[in-house]
């Protein structure tokens, strides 16, 4: 079954206690906590270690995961869905396949879990599986894919965003719509995709005049939106969600260009990675840490943006896979500590990232259904400074 607990309601702690209690059952041999990406893997490990030091086993690769499975302990095994999938495909006869195991999936709305679940049923003989999600996939927002219930079974418990708002665990969303330039309104409000040629749509949305106008709007309104009217040391920071890598590049360059003469410049950073299927349906794309598949143009821009970051913070990150992972982790810390004012993203950080200092999300991107809730929920944490 699955547990529907809204983002910001303490889902990580609930899932940890569920995993911890499962390890204490005599009938259970192994407990897996499965996340979608290495960033969530790292965050979960840190969170679990905070709750209970030495309670979990993590791994850097499939071989490490295999080693952890051979250990005779009752620690929770934290792994990514990718590592688990690779292990199942490569290893045909592991002892764990015949053991009694529990799988707890975090953010189980993600598309990859459907494939993984099928592979698990092929290999594991005795298992229980539970999914945690803040945004379940229902038939009306499945976009032709499987629903959360079709993969995990029935809903076991629900604590929705309405419950969290009533209990004052999260903040309400305040949404402001801004028409930047009237000449572009028709393209921004057109709902019938058949009336638009994709190339023309992209060309219009990335038009230099539009990019410039939106960049000026963000810079002009940043202090008011983030409550920094009385100085940069107070208030919050912001995220800017854009449609694709090309948009991230254009906005990064234009924002820095427009503020070049400002006395107090925003510290702007960006992060993205390769996503083979650019989302047009309002879902947030699942970006991994693989940068090798990027186009040379995208990689060149990312390298420059990381270089700017290195210059500002006296760091030494790069676009190779390990350097990129370290950049991600350092960037996450600096966003949480408000050392970064504005973070431009395509898909990364829009799900599973918890930063109470973040109160504003600028959006120039198609978001629908659970994609909206996931993205907006980056801003509704309660922060007691």
Please report, for each region that a protein language model flagged, where it lies by residue:
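Conserved RecA-like ASCE P-loop NTPase motor core of nucleic-acid helicases/translocases
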Residues: 4, 29-37, 234-244
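Inter-Walker segment of RecA-like/P-loop motor cores
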Residues: 49-89
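Conserved C-terminal RecA-like helicase domain
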Residues: 202-342
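Conserved SF1/SF2 helicase motif Ia
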Residues: 14-40
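Signature of the SF2 helicase/ATPase Hel1-core->accessory helical subdomain module
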Residues: 85-92, 96-199, 212, 350-385
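Walker A/P-loop
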Residues: 1-18
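Conserved helix-turn-beta segment of the N-terminal RecA-like "Helicase ATP-binding" lobe
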Residues: 23-24, 38-63, 257-263
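Short basic/glycine-enriched coil/helix segment immediately N-terminal to the Walker B
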Residues: 70-73, 88-101, 323-328, 332-340, ...
């Amino acid at each position: 079954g699955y547990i529907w607990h809204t983002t910001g309601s303490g889902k990580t702690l609930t899932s940890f206690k569920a995993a911890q209690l499962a390890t204490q059952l005599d009938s259970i041999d192994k407990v897996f906590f499965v996340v979608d990406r290495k960033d969530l893997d790292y965050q979960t490990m840190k969170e679990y270690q905070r709750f209970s030091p030495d309670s979990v086993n993590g791994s850097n690769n499939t071989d490490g995961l295999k080693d952890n499975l051979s250990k005779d302990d009752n620690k929770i095994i934290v792994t990514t869905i990718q590592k688990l999938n690779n292990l199942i495909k490569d290893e045909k006869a592991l002892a764990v396949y015949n053991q009694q195991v529990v799988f707890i999936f975090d953010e189980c709305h993600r598309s990859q879990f459907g494939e993984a679940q099928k592979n698990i049923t092929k290999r594991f003989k005795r298992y229980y599986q539970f999914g945690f999600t803040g945004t379940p996939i229902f038939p009306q927002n499945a976009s032709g894919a499987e629903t959360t219930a079709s993969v995990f079974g029935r809903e076991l418990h629900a604590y929705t965003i309405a419950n969290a708002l009533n209990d004052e665990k999260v903040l309400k969303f305040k949404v402001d719509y801004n028409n930047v330039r009237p000449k572009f309104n028709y393209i921004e409000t057109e709902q019938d995709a058949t009336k638009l040629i994709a190339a023309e749509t992209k060309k219009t949305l990335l038009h230099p005049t539009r990019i410039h106008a939106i960049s000026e709007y963000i810079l002009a309104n940043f202090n008011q939106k983030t409550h920094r009217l009385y100085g940069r040391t107070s208030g919050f920071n912001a995220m800017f969600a854009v449609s694709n890598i090309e948009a991230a590049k254009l906005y990064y360059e234009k924002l820095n260009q427009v503020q070049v003469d400002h006395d107090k410049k925003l510290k702007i950073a960006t992060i993205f990675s390769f996503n083979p299927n650019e989302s047009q349906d309002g879902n947030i794309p699942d970006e991994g840490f693989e940068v090798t598949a990027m186009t040379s143009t995208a990689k060149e821009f990312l390298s420059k943006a990381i270089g700017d970051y290195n210059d500002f913070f006296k760091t030494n990150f790069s676009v190779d896979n390990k350097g990129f992972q370290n950049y991600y982790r350092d960037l996450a810390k600096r966003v949480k500590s408000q050392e970064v004012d504005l973070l431009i993203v395509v898909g990364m950080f829009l799900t599973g990232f918890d930063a109470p200092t973040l109160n504003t999300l600028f959006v120039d991107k198609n978001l629908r259904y659970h994609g909206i809730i996931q993205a907006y929920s980056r801003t509704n944490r309660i922060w007691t400074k």
